[in-house]
Amino acid sequence: MLAPKKLKHKKFRKVRFSDASARGSGLAFGEYGLKAIGSARLNGRQIESARRVITRIVSKAGKLWINVFPGIPLTRKPTDVRMGGGKGSVDSYIFAISPGRVLFELGGVDREKAKLALCKASAKLPFSTKFVERVSCEL
C-alpha cells in the first residue's frame, strides 16, 4: 500500500476540500487522462486497484503515470474508547481530490484501449470522473 517514508509532522489537521483544482488540472505527460469531477478522499488501496485494472488492459504496450500520492495521515481512535485522551493513532494515508484534478495519464496506446482502461479504473474510485485527451493543433 502507498504511504510516505518520512513526514515533517506525524499527525495533520482535518482536510478541507477546495472548490476546484487549478494545479494538476491539465495533462502533463501522456495523451489521455482521467480527470476528477467530484471531490473525495483517495487512499492507497483505491489508487492501487485502479492501477491494476489499467495495467491489465494496457499491459506492456503503453506508459502509465500516476499523478496523486497519499501523503496526508488519517487518524482514528480505537472502538469502545471514550472521548478525550488526545488524538488517535495514524490509521491510513489519503490524498484530498478536488474537482478538475488529473489522476492517471496514459501514453503509447490507441484511443479506444485508453478509454476502456480509464473507464474501468473509474469504477474503482469513490467519485465521478471523465476521460480527457490532449488536443493537438495541426496547421
From Swiss-Prot:
What role is this protein assigned? Binds 23S rRNA and is also seen to make contacts with the A and possibly P site tRNAs.
Protein name, per record: Large ribosomal subunit protein uL16
Span-the-membrane segments of this chain are: none
Against Pfam families, the record matches this protein to:
Ribosomal_L16
Q: Entry's SUPFAM superfamilies?
A: Ribosomal protein L16p/L10e
Per the similarity annotation, which family is this?
Belongs to the universal ribosomal protein uL16 family.
Gene Ontology CC terms, in alphabetical order? cytosolic large ribosomal subunit
The alphabetized list of GO BP terms reads:
translation
**Cross-referenced NCBIfam families, in alphabetical order?**
rplP_bact
Subunit text = Part of the 50S ribosomal subunit.
One Gene Ontology term of the molecular function aspect: rRNA binding
Q: Which InterPro entries match?
A: Ribosomal_uL16 (IPR047873), Ribosomal_uL16_bact-type (IPR000114), Ribosomal_uL16_dom (IPR016180), Ribosomal_uL16_sf (IPR036920)
Q: Where does the source fall among the domains of life?
A: Bacteria
UniProt keyword annotations, A-Z? Ribonucleoprotein, Ribosomal protein, RNA-binding, rRNA-binding, tRNA-binding
Q: Which organism is it from?
A: Neorickettsia sennetsu (strain ATCC VR-367 / Miyayama)
